[in-house]
């Protein structure tokens, strides 16, 4: 499989290493600013790359969105999470002409976590729910896109849910519809996501811990391996 990388930060550098270990070929990289240290052919536009089978994006909205407005016909795996609503609308539009895969978290374990959560929420309807995520001290956005995904699962199953981000400003007891959302930043934490169900005299915790960023890179590669054989459409872990 011949892969075009959109962005060449820490994550796509991992994609390149792991993809080549699997026998795939990196045919080029698209970056905001060409760099002499990038060990692959650099391009400005997706359509300029003639021999790629798929593009894998681990970049940011500033790089990705202008590319999506261009005309190209390359299967696309997207891991950028910024400006999610705008991004999903654009990817849905593109999926009429190319196969597109999107996930806010490329770990299949996190996908499994969302399924476990969907099963637990109706069973624990009278339990309070708190969501916590922890990441390294260089992560700039909070809460994480994955935590937002977990929150969306809860919203789809419970009515009148209220997100609570900063409880120290509230001078009132917890309300039944509250969903606490907490972010921790420190050290080199790869990524941890926890759902706490707190009931009377008992608690249940569901946790996913990433032990290496390789899980996200491998997830993107595995998605690409499947996507290249798919017809045009919008794909997630649910239908890939």
From Swiss-Prot:
Residues where (S)-2,3,4,5-tetrahydrodipicolinate binds: 136, 145-146
Pathway annotation from the record: Amino-acid biosynthesis; L-lysine biosynthesis via DAP pathway; (S)-tetrahydrodipicolinate from L-aspartate: step 4/4
The keyword NAD appears for this protein: yes
Active site residues of this protein: 135 (proton donor/acceptor), 139 (proton donor)
One Pfam family here: DapB_N
Main location: cytoplasm
Disulfide bonds: none
Class of the enzyme per the UniProt entry, highest EC level: oxidoreductase
Binding-site residues for NAD(+), renumbered to this chain: 79-81, 103-106
Cell location: Cytoplasm
Record key words, sorted: Amino-acid biosynthesis, Cytoplasm, Diaminopimelate biosynthesis, Lysine biosynthesis, NAD, NADP, Oxidoreductase
UniProt-listed Gene3D superfamilies: Dihydrodipicolinate Reductase, domain 2, NAD(P)-binding Rossmann-like Domain
GO molecular function: 4-hydroxy-tetrahydrodipicolinate reductase; NAD binding; NADP binding; oxidoreductase activity, acting on CH or CH2 groups, NAD or NADP as acceptor
HAMAP family per UniProt: DapB
Name this polypeptide is given: 4-hydroxy-tetrahydrodipicolinate reductase
Species name: Staphylococcus aureus (strain JH9)
Encoding gene (name): dapB
């Amino acid at each position: 499989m011949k892969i075009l990388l959109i962005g060449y930060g820490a994550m796509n550098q991992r994609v390149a290493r792991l993809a080549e270990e699997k026998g795939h070929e990196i045919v080029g990289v698209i970056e905001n600013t060409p760099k002499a240290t990038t060990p692959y052919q650099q391009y400005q536009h997706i359509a300029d790359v003639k021999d790629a089978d798929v593009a894998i994006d681990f970049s940011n909205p500033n790089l990705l969105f202008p590319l999506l407005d261009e005309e190209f016909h390359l299967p696309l795996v997207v891991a950028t999470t910024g400006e999610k609503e705008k991004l999903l609308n654009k990817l849905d539009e593109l999926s009429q002409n190319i196969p597109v895969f999107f996930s806010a978290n490329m770990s299949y374990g996190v996908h499994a976590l969302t399924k476990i959560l969907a099963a637990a929420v109706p069973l624990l309807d009278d339990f309070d729910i708190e969501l916590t995520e922890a990441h390294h001290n260089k992560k700039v956005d909070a809460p994480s896109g994955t935590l937002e995904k977990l929150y969306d699962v809860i919203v789809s199953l419970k009515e009148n849910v209220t997100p609570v981000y900063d409880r120290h400003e509230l001078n009132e007891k917890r309300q039944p519809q509250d969903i606490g959302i907490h972010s921790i930043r420190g050290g080199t934490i790869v990524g941890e996501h926890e759902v706490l169900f707190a009931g009377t005299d008992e608690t249940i915790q569901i946790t996913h811990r990433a032990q290496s960023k390789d899980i996200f890179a491998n997830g993107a590669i595995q998605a690409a391996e499947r996507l290249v054989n798919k017809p045009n459409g919008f794909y997630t872990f649910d239908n890939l």
